[in-house]
Amino acid sequence: AKMSLSSYILILTLVLFSQGILLSASKSIRNLEDDMVFNTFRLGKAFQKEDTAEKSVVAPSLEQYKNDENS
């Protein structure tokens, strides 16, 4: 009887321990995801800025091309 009780306690300890690990892991994963989302957002903003800069360079030549095509 003593043996099964100690193994039960051992299993219970392992389960609680692994749940604790999972909990802390999921927390750090969530933090990682937040960082990734934040970085992606910042990258996206940077790309948008570059994009508008490129558009202001490209757009005039496109307009010229359209006008040439119509005439």
Curated annotation (Swiss-Prot):
Record-stated family: Belongs to the melanin-concentrating hormone family.
Biological process (GO), any one: chemical synaptic transmission
Record bears the keyword Ribosomal protein: no
Gene that this sequence comes from: PMCH
Domain of life of the source: Eukaryota
Organism expressing this protein natively: Carlito syrichta (Philippine tarsier)
Signal peptide (residue range): 1-20
PANTHER family, sorted: MELANIN-CONCENTRATING HORMONE (PTHR12091), PRO-MCH (PTHR12091:SF0)
InterPro entries cross-referenced by the UniProt entry: Prepro-melanin_conc_hormone (IPR005456)
GO MF: melanin-concentrating hormone activity; type 1 melanin-concentrating hormone receptor binding
Keywords: Secreted, Signal
Gene Ontology CC: extracellular region; synapse
Compartmental location: Secreted
Protein name: Pro-MCH
UniProt entry tagged with the keyword NADP: no
